Swiss-Prot record:
GO cellular component: host cell membrane; membrane
Protein name as annotated: Uncharacterized protein UL15A
Gene: UL15A
Sequence ranges on the Extracellular membrane side: 1-79
Residues passing through the membrane, by range: 80-97
Biased amino acid composition, Polar residues: 56-71
Amino acid sequence: MKRMIRSHGRKTECQMTSAGERRGSAVGAPICGSGTRRGSGANERRDSDVGPIAHSSGTRRGSANETSACTRTDHQKADIGLWFMFLVFGLCSWLAMRYRAQ
């Protein structure tokens, strides 16, 4: 379980916000599902800040799958945003050079 979470560890906002939870939670707890399984008030409050992940079923398999899917989609969103900004910047600079030459 721990190995699977580590292999998906990417430096995204989701991973960073949930890394603090893993430090304070029990040994070997899944990152996003720690508060729902243990049932302590502080962790449930912290999980509700994360978002829809807090409403997981609480099973080990489900929360681990949501963790890896969460990090993957956030990582892909960041990549798509960067490529889109790069594309828009390139298009604008190309248009500016083209109209300046005329």
